[in-house]
Amino acid sequence: MVGLAELHSRPVLGLGPNWRQFALLVAINAFVGGMVGMERSVLPLLAKDEFGIASSTAAVSFVASFGLAKAIANLYAGNLSERFGRRSVLIAGWLFAVPVPFILIFAPSWGWVIGANLLLGVNQGFAWSMTVNMKIDLVGPSRRGLALGLNEAAGYLSVAVAAYLAGVIAQSHGLRPEPFYLGIAFAAVGLALSVCFARDTSGHMRVEAGPHAAATPLRRAFAEATWRRPRLVSLTQAGFVNNLNDGLAWGIFPLFFAASGLSIERIGLLAASYPLVWGGLQLVTGWTSDIFGRTPLIVAGMLIQGIALAIAGVGDSFGTWLIALGLLGLGTAMVYPTLLASIGDLVRPTDRATTLGVYRFWRDGGAMAGALLGGAVADLFGFKLAIELVAALTAGSGVAVLVIALMKPGRTGQEVTV
């Protein structure tokens, strides 16, 4: 029989009982997003203007290094959190962030910038993964889409604000060092909040899972999400392609806009508009998927992203590109939290962190692939063809999700027994 003291101390699931920790994790993830945002409008231009890098492929190599490090960190973050606790991995992620702005400020060569982005990738893989898992742990299965919508909204609204501020600062003061002072502040506050106030949520996960549930080994979770379970595989490939076009938007779009004659401030505004729409609308799209199901939002979102990229590729004015990036943000908002919630629907609570780590490994590997593919095609055939190629791949990914969902029917949007 459970004693009164044990019953009293047992974690309770739900947004209401856990709103303080939930709100804290929203704030922490905003600072995680800010670390990436400070780079989005500045670093591609820094490669060309300060380090004299002419090749588009070389100029976007920082995105590739970031994507590689983040993908690997994602893969192991869930497994490490099962062994050492969510909070410990969150704090470790912030420790990797601390040197990044200083390296970017003082980097004597482009190799140092690539190294800084390896550290930033680990920061994002550990810290962002843990804010995702900790929020899911706290709220339980019924509010999963809402929780992830709030998490991703906070992160990507912060990306937008930081990208815009960095662009404005760079326009007024230069590409270095002033824009990267933002990163020093973000890392200091994010680390302090995580160390002083964040609490581990592994106990909440165990309440949902039950007392005798055992986690699936990483090797098996990797196989299931990569080739064994068609529904999981369809979600994994959609995440990969979604970030393929994000890698293109991060690495290639600033170069494309600069080659078209836009000022740094306008490039910063465009770089901010995409994550601004993406982040803001996730407040609605995650909750919507809880009610109407995941698949319709994923398929429609991927198709809208493909259309947006096609418009960006043929556009030749600031107004057209602003509309295209707004549409890209809309499509991404429909997809991003919904894919995460769908993974959570299809696996047991004890497997969730590990399987989400595998999914995020492939998803963020897409950013690396998008930067390298976009850079290589841009070097050979020009920016516009690179953008149109990724547009076609994105639309095709949405069709693939629809086909597999029709072949393997079953509504996602609620817990599935596996």
Q: Each predicted region: which residue ranges?
A:
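Helix-loop junctions on the cytosolic side of multi-pass membrane transporters
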Residues: 194-209, 403-415
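Structural signature of the two symmetry-related core transmembrane helices
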Residues: 88-102, 296-311
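Residue-level signature of mid-helix packing/kink "hotspots" within the transmembrane helices
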Residues: 67-75, 160, 275-283, 367-368
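Symmetry-related core transmembrane helices of the 12-TM Major Facilitator Superfamily/SLC fold
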Residues: 178-195, 387-403
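Helix-loop boundary and gating motifs at the non-cytosolic
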Residues: 16-67, 233-234, 238, 242-260
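Helix-to-loop junctions at the C-terminal end of transmembrane segments
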Residues: 73-85, 170, 281-293, 378-379
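Cytoplasmic helix-loop-helix junction between adjacent transmembrane helices
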Residues: 116-156, 341-342
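Juxtamembrane intracellular "pre-TM" segments in multi-pass secondary transporters
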Residues: 2-19, 200-235, 418
